[in-house]
Amino acid sequence: MANSTTVTEFILLGLSDACELQVLIFLGFLLTYFLILLGNFLIIFITLVDRRLYTPMYYFLRNFAMLEIWFTSVIFPKMLTNIITGHKTISLLGCFLQAFLYFFLGTTEFFLLAVMSFDRYVAICNPLRYATIMSKRVCVQLVFCSWMSGLLLIIVPSSIVFQQPFCGPNIINHFFCDNFPLMELICADTSLVEFLGFVIANFSLLGTLAVTATCYGHILYTILHIPSAKERKKAFSTCSSHIIVVSLFYGSCIFMYVRSGKNGQGEDHNKVVALLNTVVTPTLNPFIYTLRNKQVKQVFREHVSKFQKFSQT
């Protein structure tokens, strides 16, 4: 279908129309974005500078931190600009690009979370072969496959949406270009792209969740059969942070996207739930992974101590 689009820009309504709340919302999101960048860059820095953290687990964590930075940077800068300037518009191309990157990076995160759960499964359930199975080459291949899977799954439905005609209203009741609000503005039959979106959401979300759940089922079974209480606690502590992240991220996304149809989605509810996987979860992730990880905390304290000694000389 030829693109007979007449709309050149969209209006993002954001979270609230109340003028008195705009400054508060802006400051809140600005602080949140700063914390996300600080926390994830800190993870990247720590896992790069200390050779003790040159392990598959921290290699995957570093890649996940990079993904989180890009994922949130797709939304936050434009959202903050719209709030502070009062101009809530986004160009047609900008909206398509934002939607594509949001789903591409988000889908890649699902696959990377599944890879991280498999890494923990091998480490706990098959520790003697861990170094052999999770070699550097395998780790690089798993990360590459995660990126390629996200790209290949999203590029087809995104290109179909891009070719659709937008000739009617241009108001999106959201704070970014999400899939369902965008499809409501298409002036043509959207059954094909809806079906593709539903299938891809089920495959990427529920498929990777099945892998993650299976891995952690085996992990919990193995942990419960460890005779030493101290070793059980140590083994569980390496996985608990990942379980928390998975629960938050998957829970919000399944609520939003694993449903067929674009009608009756409850836009206001979707905006609130979208805050979980675009704002709350990325903010909590660095703190969950660092505050619950003794090795990361130890390395961080050592580097802070070195910096303090260096600054005092």
UniProtKB/Swiss-Prot annotation:
Disulfide bonds join 95-177. Keywords: Cell membrane, Disulfide bond, G-protein coupled receptor, Glycoprotein, Membrane, Olfaction, Receptor, Sensory transduction, Transducer, Transmembrane, Transmembrane helix. Glycans are attached at residue 3. It is found in: Cell membrane. Pfam families: 7tm_4. It is a multi-pass membrane protein. GO terms for cellular component: membrane; plasma membrane. SUPFAM superfamilies: Family A G protein-coupled receptor-like. The chain crosses the membrane at residues 25-45, 64-84, 96-116, 142-162, 192-212, 238-258, 271-291. GO terms for biological process: G protein-coupled receptor signaling pathway; sensory perception of smell. PROSITE patterns: G_PROTEIN_RECEP_F1_1, G_PROTEIN_RECEP_F1_2. PANTHER family: OLFACTORY RECEPTOR (PTHR26454), OLFACTORY RECEPTOR 6E1 (PTHR26454:SF2). This is Olfactory receptor 6E1. The gene is Or6e1.
